[in-house]
Amino acid sequence: MRCLAFVRFPAPAGLAGDKLRAVLEEGVPRYKGIPGLHRKYFLGNSSFGAGVYEWESRATAQAFYNEQWRERLRTVYGAVPQVEYFDVHAMVDNDSGTMRIEV
């Protein structure tokens, strides 16, 4: 069963505009080609930064969020992220015109 991971951390002060773009230009390519990762969204507002990851399975997701990953986010964003896992029971993708039920 696929898994969504919701990763959240306090928004670093001053991370906007050109500085945010620079962080994303460095960070986004890291996620291309990771085995088991289908999609990743980089999110944020004035209070929090977040990521939504769609994984092949919960085990794949949990293996990815290791100490090295946590330390890198602590270095880049100044905080240890919180990770929550959600089982994907069904999905509708209007871009591709597909649906999937996994229960």
Residue ranges and their predicted role:
Residues E71-T75:
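A common structural junction motif
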Residues V52-E54:
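A short, exposed loop/beta-hairpin motif centered on an aromatic-Gly-Thr core
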Residues M1-F48, R58-E67, A79-V103:
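Short S/T/G/P-rich N-terminal loop/turn motif that feeds into the first structured element of a domain
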